[in-house]
Structures are given as structure tokens and as C-alpha cells.
Swiss-Prot record:
<comment type="similarity">
    <text>Belongs to the class I-like SAM-binding methyltransferase superfamily. Cation-dependent O-methyltransferase family. CCoAMT subfamily.</text>
</comment>
<dbReference type="GO" id="GO:0009809">
    <property type="term" value="P:lignin biosynthetic process"/>
</dbReference>
<dbReference type="Pfam" id="PF01596">
    <property type="entry name" value="Methyltransf_3"/>
</dbReference>
<feature type="binding site">
    <location>
        <position position="93"/>
    </location>
    <ligand>
        <name>S-adenosyl-L-methionine</name>
    </ligand>
</feature>
<feature type="binding site">
    <location>
        <position position="190"/>
    </location>
    <ligand>
        <name>a divalent metal cation</name>
    </ligand>
</feature>
<dbReference type="GO" id="GO:0032259">
    <property type="term" value="P:methylation"/>
</dbReference>
<keyword id="KW-0489">Methyltransferase</keyword>
<feature type="binding site">
    <location>
        <begin position="87"/>
        <end position="88"/>
    </location>
    <ligand>
        <name>S-adenosyl-L-methionine</name>
    </ligand>
</feature>
<feature type="binding site">
    <location>
        <position position="194"/>
    </location>
    <ligand>
        <name>substrate</name>
    </ligand>
</feature>
<feature type="binding site">
    <location>
        <position position="85"/>
    </location>
    <ligand>
        <name>S-adenosyl-L-methionine</name>
    </ligand>
</feature>
<protein>
    <recommendedName>
        <fullName>Caffeoyl-CoA O-methyltransferase 1</fullName>
        <ecNumber>2.1.1.104</ecNumber>
    </recommendedName>
</protein>
<feature type="binding site">
    <location>
        <position position="63"/>
    </location>
    <ligand>
        <name>S-adenosyl-L-methionine</name>
    </ligand>
</feature>
<dbReference type="InterPro" id="IPR050362">
    <property type="entry name" value="Cation-dep_OMT"/>
</dbReference>
<dbReference type="GO" id="GO:0046872">
    <property type="term" value="F:metal ion binding"/>
</dbReference>
<feature type="binding site">
    <location>
        <position position="163"/>
    </location>
    <ligand>
        <name>a divalent metal cation</name>
    </ligand>
</feature>
<feature type="binding site">
    <location>
        <position position="165"/>
    </location>
    <ligand>
        <name>S-adenosyl-L-methionine</name>
    </ligand>
</feature>
<feature type="binding site">
    <location>
        <position position="111"/>
    </location>
    <ligand>
        <name>S-adenosyl-L-methionine</name>
    </ligand>
</feature>
Length: 247
């Protein structure tokens, strides 16, 4: 049986506030993962972009290094070539994707803020992968609607990554399911939303966590009930749900 001192030490190693980026109970364990298998294998350009992003006031928005590593390997495993990213920020996950896809691969990248993207663009250019990226500034929904209306892009994407406005995730899914190919993947980021999905109503949460929590819960329920996809929810980063289109 644990002593009071051991219990206090255990609690001290856990995240006390809902809203922490990592979902692991122990900061030390997460640091072990980063220092043992993530940082030593992180490409120099991704390390540089991560360090640039860390200086930005909204750096909590970036994809975590372990998730970037996961995405990079996943894209190689599925041989993704034609991809899409909704929500770019400074481009850490975008760079992970660009490094993974072949030389003639393409990424349609959309974000409402070009300024953030341009913060990381010099690093992406130096890495020699900027030619793979077609960046569009502005809301993604009108672009998706146009693509569906044109009909040329139906079932054409191998992989789509969404890390944007959580209150529109359901709206994105309604459109993306038509654009991803059968057998292709859609990855929705933040689906465990800082652990708030299981938090009691009176749990301490940052305002933005509390605001978007219900939208994330709605998405998770909708994905679980969608017969057109197979799903797998992974506790990587802030939670990512992979959806494989089967019909």
C-alpha cells in the first residue's frame, strides 16, 4: 500500500489542470518518450521549426513532436501522395507530411492566417519541400464545397489531416468523406481535447478548452456511428482519430 508521501509524489507527477498538451499522467514519462525516441530522430528542419514555433505566443496550437513523428511514419506506411491539411499554423505537421510524401507528392494546405504559415515557411523552403505545398489562405469550407461541386476531386486524396476550428469538424467531415479515396485516411486532431472529454463539469479548464469540448464530444460520437469509415482513436499528442473510408 502506498504511503501518504508516495501518494503525494504520485499526484505531483500528474497534470493538475485539464488543458495540458500531453495526455500522459506523468510529465517524466512523456519527457522520456521525447528524449529517447522522438528528439534523437527528429529531422533538423523539424527541430528548427519547432524551436521557431516555441517563441510564438500561441505555440500551444502546434502539433507535438511525437505526433509529428507519428504522422511522418503513417504517411510512409500508406504510401500517401495526394494529401490535404486543414489548419496549418506555422507548419510543423505540414513539414512532417512534406518530408514523408514522394518528390511529386502534393499537399493542399488551408489556413485562415497566412502570417503564421510564413513564420515557418523559410524553414520549409530550406528543407527543399515547399514545391509540394499549395497554400490557400481563408476558410476551408468554401474551398471544399467548390471541389465537391466540380466533381474532379471526388475520392482523390490519400490522406487528409484536420487540426483547425473544432466547431466545424462535423462540417469538415461531411465534405471530406467525399474527397478522400476508399481506403484513404482522414486524421482528426485533438479528439481527446486535453483530456476534457472525460472531465466532470466542474473540472478546472481553460476557457477555450471548455468552449470547444462539446464540439469534440459531438464529433467523436458522430465518427463512432458513421458506417462509411473504420476508426481508431489514439492517445498521441492531444488525441488523434484516424478514419479509414471503406465505402
Amino acid at each position: 500500500m502506498a504511503t501518504n508521501g508516495e501518494e503525494q509524489q504520485s499526484q505531483a507527477g500528474r497534470h493538475q489542470e485539464v488543458g495540458h498538451k500531453s495526455l500522459l499522467q506523468s510529465d517524466a514519462l512523456y519527457q522520456y518518450i521525447l528524449e529517447t525516441s522522438v528528439y534523437p530522430r527528429e529531422p533538423e528542419c523539424m527541430k528548427e521549426l519547432r524551436e521557431v514555433t516555441a517563441k510564438h505566443p500561441w505555440n500551444i496550437m502546434t502539433t507535438s513532436a511525437d505526433e509529428g513523428q507519428f504522422l511522418n511514419m503513417l504517411l510512409k506506411l500508406v504510401n500517401a501522395k495526394n494529401t490535404m491539411e486543414i489548419g496549418v499554423y506555422t507548419g510543423y505537421s505540414l513539414l512532417a507530411t512534406a518530408l514523408a510524401i514522394p518528390e511529386d507528392g502534393k499537399i493542399l494546405a488551408m489556413d485562415i492566417n497566412r502570417e503564421n504559415y510564413e513564420l515557418g515557411l523559410p524553414v520549409i523552403q530550406k528543407a527543399g519541400v515547399a514545391h509540394k505545398i499549395d497554400f490557400k489562405e481563408g476558410p476551408a469550407l468554401p474551398v471544399l464545397d467548390q471541389m465537391i461541386e466540380d466533381g474532379k476531386c471526388h475520392g482523390s486524396f490519400d490522406f487528409i489531416f484536420v487540426d483547425a476550428d473544432k466547431d466545424n469538424y462535423i462540417n469538415y467531415h461531411k465534405r471530406l468523406i467525399e474527397l478522400v479515396k476508399v481506403g484513404g485516411l482522414i486524421g482528426y486532431d485533438n479528439t481527446l481535447w486535453n483530456g476534457s472529454v472525460v472531465a466532470p463539469p466542474d473540472a478546472p479548464m481553460r476557457k477555450y478548452v471548455r468552449y470547444y469540448r462539446d464540439f469534440v464530444l459531438e464529433l467523436n460520437k458522430a465518427l463512432a456511428a458513421d458506417p462509411r469509415i473504420e476508426i481508431c482513436m489514439l492517445p498521441v499528442g492531444d488525441g488523434i482519430t484516424l478514419c479509414r473510408r471503406i465505402q
